[in-house]
């Protein structure tokens, strides 16, 4: 069944959108399987994205989990950052090999993020690469400033954690001012009510959010592995269930090509004869070269053509060429070539040895 890939930075509402889509599909009686970081790691851990080796292992585990679940019965939803276009292409190839449709849902949060990180331009053009700006908090007297303190009259982001995610408000006063912890929920209550996200067990530090935003490769509908593409800006925009449903269940699956389609298996008799004929040719060649001198034409068993002898040949070299010939012939089986197998192998040896 189809594969739905969710893409976006942390705190963009991906998990909430996944729950919406899963609930809608299950209400229609469809079986839905969700693959996310927590399912693979055992618990959601944001520090994975700060270590390239661990992140690479995570992508491999996510890809393997998706490949195991792809079937004709269940809808598979991948809930992860999926910010690398090369990884999205690998997922596209998995769906193509399974002959099942695929679509991409890109979640963008237009507002501010934790620690002062802001994504600009997402509202104007959600399909382009977003720009990122972030400024760490300054220190005064060797100690970090309190949350919400202004520096030299410049507004400083006030971060708070509401429902285990970060929100931000920018005070308008130019005077340094302390914001009490008791007042923080009131500053962001209205925003949190509008954009409450699915609870996440991971907290992304500002430095990690900035790094993820800088290396984020936004989806582009011009790429075949990024379409059909559905871009959702903010949590207020409704999920396009009708369009997603049409992309998953009404569109044709991408056709397989040579890299994703299994090669036809050769019959047992063909493989047996191929192995037998090539072995006889090698045995005859090793025996004939014992009394041959360079320039002689060697007549080998089962062949009507001759092989010009130029130098002594080792069994290791001939065995390597035999394996290459067998691998190529198995992918291009043709029963009409059975009588010519010995001559074909002799021609292959003649071209490879000179």
From Swiss-Prot:
Q: Which residues bind ATP?
A: 8-15
> Would you say which domain of life the source belongs to?
Eukaryota
Residues modified as Phosphoserine are 200
Q: Which keywords appear in this protein's UniProt record, sorted alphabetically?
A: ATP-binding, Nucleotide-binding, Phosphoprotein
Q: Name one GO molecular function term.
A: ATP binding
| GO biological process terms held by the UniProt record | tRNA wobble uridine modification
Query: What InterPro entries does its record include?
Result: KTI12/PSTK, P-loop_NTPase
Q: Which family does it belong to?
A: Belongs to the KTI12 family.
Kindly provide the name given to this protein in its UniProt entry: Protein KTI12 homolog
């Amino acid at each position: 069944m189809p594969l739905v890939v969710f893409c976006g930075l942390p705190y963009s509402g991906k998990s909430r959108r996944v729950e919406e889509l899963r609930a809608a599909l299950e209400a229609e009686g469809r079986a839905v399987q969700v693959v996310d970081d927590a399912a693979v790691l055992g618990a959601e851990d944001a520090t994975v994205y700060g270590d390239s080796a661990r992140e690479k292992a995570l992508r491999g585990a996510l890809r393997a989990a998706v490949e195991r679940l792809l079937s004709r019965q269940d809808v598979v939803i991948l809930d992860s950052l999926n910010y690398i276009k090369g990884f999205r292409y690998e997922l596209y190839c998995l769906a193509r090999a399974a002959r099942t449709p695929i679509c991409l849902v890109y979640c963008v949060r237009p507002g501010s993020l934790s620690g002062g990180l802001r994504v600009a331009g997402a509202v104007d053009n959600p399909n382009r690469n977003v720009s990122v700006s972030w400024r760490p908090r300054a220190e005064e007297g060797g100690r970090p400033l309190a949350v919400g303190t202004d520096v030299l009259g410049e507004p400083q982001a006030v971060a708070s954690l509401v429902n285990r995610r970060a929100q931000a408000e920018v005070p308008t006063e130019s005077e340094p001012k302390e914001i009490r912890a008791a007042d923080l929920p009131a500053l962001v209550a209205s925003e949190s009510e509008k954009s409450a996200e699915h609870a996440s067990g991971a907290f992304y530090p500002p430095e990690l959010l900035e790094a993820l935003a800088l290396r984020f490769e936004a989806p582009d509908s011009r790429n075949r592995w990024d379409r059909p593409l559905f871009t959702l800006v903010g949590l207020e925009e409704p999920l396009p269930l009708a369009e997603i449903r049409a992309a998953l269940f009404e569109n044709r699956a991408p056709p397989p090509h040579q890299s994703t389609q299994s090669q036809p298996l050769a019959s047992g008799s063909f493989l047996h004869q191929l192995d037998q004929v090539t072995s006889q040719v090698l045995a005859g060649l090793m025996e004939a070269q014992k009394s041959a001198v360079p320039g002689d034409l060697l007549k080998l068993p089962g062949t009507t053509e001759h092989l010009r002898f130029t130098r002594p040949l080792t069994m290791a070299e001939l065995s390597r060429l035999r394996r290459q010939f067998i691998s190529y012939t198995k992918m291009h089986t043709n029963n009409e070539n059975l009588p010519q197998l010995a001559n074909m192998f002799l021609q292959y040896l003649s071209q490879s040895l000179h």
